[in-house]
Amino acid sequence: MKTPITEAIATADNQGRFLSNTELQAVNGRYQRATASLTAAKALTGSAQRLITGAAQAVYNKFPYTTQMPGPAYASSAIGKAKCARDIGYYLRMVTYTLVVGGTGPMDEYLVAGLEEINRSFDLSPSWYIEALQYIKNSHGLSGQVANEANAYIDYAINTSL
């Protein structure tokens, strides 16, 4: 799994050298931000159910047809609503994983790689997930560096969903 630290190590190793001062400074910077990232991951995990429920409702409010259209891609039934919440939860989990490792590797490997194909196959609109992620970003209740760390990965998820 790629993280800024593993990438720096891989580059140095491929070139048969020790980490440069610049690379060591980047690694040190990551460790300095790690506490904020772990705090954000813990807070998002602790608030996951509230955030997922609120995000799903934000999607239904902005796109009311999602609760009125029949079919497996819509939330017109309890099963459809459960699928929507499950998918939002998956995005939120990926955000927490990226926070823990300090890089987009988990999201790139487990989410982004097949996202377009999944959305197309199941006729899912990226705008639904963008709305859900915006809700999470605006409602997580984090502040300072903790919020900055979380928001960076939420924004990454939003931008890769486009």
Curated annotation (Swiss-Prot):
GO BP terms in the entry: photosynthesis
Pfam families in UniProt: Phycobilisome
Cysteines engaged in disulfide bonds, as pairs: none
Post-translational modification comment from the UniProt entry: Contains one covalently linked phycocyanobilin chromophore.
Main location class: plastid
Gene3D superfamilies (UniProt xref): Phycocyanins
Superkingdom as given in the UniProt entry: Eukaryota
Compartment(s): Plastid, Chloroplast thylakoid membrane
Topology with respect to the bilayer: Peripheral membrane protein
CDD domains for the chain: PC-PEC_alpha
UniProt keyword annotation of Cytoplasm present: no
Subunit comment: Heterodimer of an alpha and a beta subunit. Dimers further assemble into trimers and the trimers into hexamers. The basic functional unit of phycobiliproteins is a ring-shaped hexamer formed from two back-to-back trimers contacting via the alpha chain subunits. The trimers are composed of alpha/beta subunit heterodimers arranged around a three-fold axis of symmetry. The phycoerythrins also contain a gamma subunit which is located in the center of the hexamer.
Family per similarity comment: Belongs to the phycobiliprotein family.
Known role: Light-harvesting photosynthetic bile pigment-protein from the phycobiliprotein complex (phycobilisome, PBS). Phycocyanin is the major phycobiliprotein in the PBS rod.
Protein name: R-phycocyanin-1 subunit alpha
